[in-house]
Structures are given as structure tokens and as C-alpha cells.
């Protein structure tokens, strides 16, 4: 018995093969992009701008864990001015995270200093996706508080 195809069936079969080949090419390209283009998976400052405060804290904790720290979030209320504690060897950093659209003022710096003492940390930081007021920068300098503003945070994101 001989298989016979009509011209229409033959054309349809060729069309199906071409569709299948296109799907394979698309899948290969997608896989190549995902495996070779790590930049596509990076978090950008724009992504951070869309985060909630809690998401920003969780992101920062993951960032510090990736830098070799053991980082944990503090309890949401009564955190004594800090959102994260990052430890690496003898170094303990109390971190205040501010995911804001406005300017971060003195209060965040004061909270970081208070939290550093409360958590017996060696250092303290305030990290924001925004900017700091001039007086916050002066207060931080006088108290040894490390400040990461939008520019520094963007640089850190590009290093990862």
C-alpha cells in the first residue's frame, strides 16, 4: 500500500515543519539570551523605585548576603531605628533603608545612630534610592554614618 498525499496535504506538512523549526530557533535564542546576557536579569534603580519599603529591605539584605555578610531584617515595629543588621567577621553594620521619592532628612541619620548603639554595631548606614538633605549629610559626617544615595546605590547595582 502506498501513501499518497494531496498537494494541499503536502503543503500543510511543509508549513507545519517550518512552524516547528521557527519554534526551535526561538527557544534556542531565548535560552542563549538568558544564559549569556546576565545584564537582562539585573535589578536597576528603576526597579528599586517601584519597590515597597519592605521589598527594598529584602533586596538590600540579599545584596549584603551576596557580598559575604550575614544579613537579617529587624522586626517591623520597634526596630530601634534600623531595618537590617549585616555581620561579617567582627564587623556589624546597622542599616536604615529608605525607599523614598523625596529627600531623606536628619531623622533617618539619627535613627541609624540610635540603632547602632541599640544593636551594638560597629558601623551604621542609611541607604536610599533618593537623595539626602544637606543637613543629613553634615550630621552623618559628624557621627560617622555611611550614606548611600541614589548615585552610590546605582554604582553598587552596576558592580554586581
Where are these regions (language model features)?
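Mixed-charge (Asp/Glu-Lys/Arg
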Residues: 1-160
Amino acid at each position: 500500500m502506498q501513501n499518497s498525499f494531496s498537494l494541499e496535504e503536502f503543503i500543510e506538512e511543509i508549513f507545519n515543519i517550518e512552524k516547528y523549526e521557527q519554534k526551535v530557533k526561538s527557544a534556542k535564542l531565548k535560552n542563549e539570551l538568558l544564559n549569556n546576557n546576565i545584564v537582562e536579569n539585573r535589578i536597576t534603580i528603576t526597579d528599586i523605585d517601584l519597590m515597597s519599603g519592605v521589598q527594598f529591605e529584602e533586596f538590600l539584605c540579599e545584596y549584603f548576603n551576596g557580598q559575604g555578610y550575614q544579613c537579617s531584617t529587624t522586626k517591623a515595629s520597634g526596630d530601634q531605628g534600623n531595618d537590617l543588621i549585616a555581620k561579617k567577621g567582627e564587623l556589624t553594620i546597622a542599616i536604615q533603608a529608605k525607599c523614598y521619592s523625596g529627600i531623606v532628612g536628619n531623622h533617618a541619620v539619627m535613627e541609624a545612630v540610635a540603632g547602632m548603639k541599640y544593636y551594638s554595631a560597629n558601623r551604621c548606614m542609611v541607604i536610599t534610592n533618593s537623595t539626602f538633605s544637606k543637613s543629613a549629610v553634615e550630621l552623618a559626617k559628624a557621627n560617622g554614618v555611611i550614606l548611600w544615595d541614589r548615585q552610590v546605590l546605582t554604582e553598587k547595582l552596576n558592580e554586581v
